[in-house]
């Protein structure tokens, strides 16, 4: 515990709040190119093959991002738009790919929560 005299000499420093999605550099989304598209397994109590992609962003960073929804058309060299938001059961995956933007197609036959998956309104 510092004395009052010590606090006068050197006041307390405020804690620095770090962003949870630093590589976006305070932007809402960033564009990038897929360098690898693959599946991976989640942490302990869960079991699945989660679709993820390694993306090289326009600022030079390379991040792992999650591909939401059922089936996708992404492959190497696809241009994608990513947003922040981690996947709780995939360590190291802190970004999501936006569906229905740039080279990513929306989810087919999606009826509810369509805007999150880039699906057009069914006729």
UniProtKB/Swiss-Prot annotation:
A single MF term (Gene Ontology): structural constituent of ribosome
Compositional bias ranges of the Basic residues kind: 9-21
SUPFAM superfamilies recorded: Nucleic acid-binding proteins
GO cellular component: small ribosomal subunit
Residues bearing PTM 3-methylthioaspartic acid: 89
Keyword RNA-binding: yes
Keywords: Methylation, Ribonucleoprotein, Ribosomal protein, RNA-binding, rRNA-binding, tRNA-binding
Record region (Disordered): 1-28
GO biological process: translation
Disulfide bridge map: none
InterPro entries in UniProt: NA-bd_OB-fold (IPR012340), Ribosomal_uS12 (IPR006032), Ribosomal_uS12_bac (IPR005679)
Oligomer and partners: Part of the 30S ribosomal subunit. Contacts proteins S8 and S17. May interact with IF1 in the 30S initiation complex.
Family: Belongs to the universal ribosomal protein uS12 family.
Role description: With S4 and S5 plays an important role in translational accuracy.
The name this protein goes by in its record: Small ribosomal subunit protein uS12
Gene of this entry: rpsL
